[in-house]
């Protein structure tokens, strides 16, 4: 039997340095990744170091609202 809410949810990770640069129009775009997280194990916002093709380096990507 399945319980009420699923533990796994899809989340979108967005580059934090591209978001800051986009205000000044220095960046060509904003890097985003789609991944899954377990809501029970990580109830807080997810932050991972991923490669950003617009910054050409590994940066911190934070979870955003859908």
Curated annotation (Swiss-Prot):
It holds the Pfam family Ribosomal_L33. InterPro entries: Ribosomal_bL33, Ribosomal_bL33_CS, Ribosomal_bL33_sf, Ribosomal_zn-bd. Its main location: plastid. GO terms for biological process: translation. It comes from the Eukaryota. GO terms for cellular component: chloroplast; ribonucleoprotein complex; ribosome. Keywords: Chloroplast, Plastid, Ribonucleoprotein, Ribosomal protein. The keyword Transmembrane does not apply. The keyword Plastid applies. It is found in: Plastid, Chloroplast. GO terms for molecular function: structural constituent of ribosome. SUPFAM superfamilies: Zn-binding ribosomal proteins. Belongs to the bacterial ribosomal protein bL33 family. This is Large ribosomal subunit protein bL33c.
